[in-house]
Amino acid sequence: MPLYEVEQETERVILVGVSQQDGDDAEDSVAELAELVETAGAVVVGTLIQKRENIHPGTYVGTGKVFELEELIEETGATGIVCDDELSPAQLKNLEEALKTKVMDRTLIILDIFAARASTSEGKIQVELAQLKYRLSRLSGLGRSLSRLGGGIGTRGPGEKKLEMDRRLINSRVAQLNRELKEVQRHREVNRQQRKRSGIPVVAVVGYTNAGKSTLLNHLTNAEVLEEDKLFATLDPTTRILELTNNQKVLMTDTVGFIRKLPHHLIDAFQIGRASCRERV
């Protein structure tokens, strides 16, 4: 046993959101973001929500709020901020330069959780592809932010491997992953056709993340799907047989849960779950 154990310091972050009209769900959305951040392994030390008609194109929040964030970072000892919407490359770069701290957004946090949860070959490929495509347009801001702070949230790929930061190598890796994905999906299609020929009805358990879908599947089928009081405890669909009282059988599949503000380009990370649902229509 080693004499000393080096533990990675827990990241301390401030959540930042924009409320664009009275009665919107900005507060609920930021509360959900807090759950995401905690699931990713960080601690929330502050929250700032600005009311404004439109998200600032350059810095997400207005200039005055950027100054407030500087003060809040100093007061709380925060190691970074997390914005409740996906930041553009310019917003990421400008905030990182203004605040001199690690800048993240909702998409980066979700991808980090996906990377930790993916267990199948297809899931890992889909997640890494989504992570690399997200990084490609943001290498400037992300590079400074992540390299200075030594990694942590946003640097972890599937299996805890460190994600590539070089543009040329990222493009090469994306091409390789696309080839691997086509092969994996070809095998999945063969399995789907076999299930279809069996004539057994298939049911997808669909709902919000952390709503209890895995618990329901375990209760009905005596499966042993991971149950946790965390967002995205399930990333890869699990299929089990349910025997009904009339000796009829159905196949039940646990799917990835829904969540607010999931960017369209990130839907690819849900491809497995979406394909599972399409089978049942």
Task: Spell out what each predicted region is.
Residues 4-13, 142-268, 274-278:
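Conserved G1/Walker A P-loop phosphate-binding module
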Residues 64-66, 267-270:
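Charged helix-capping and loop-helix junction motifs
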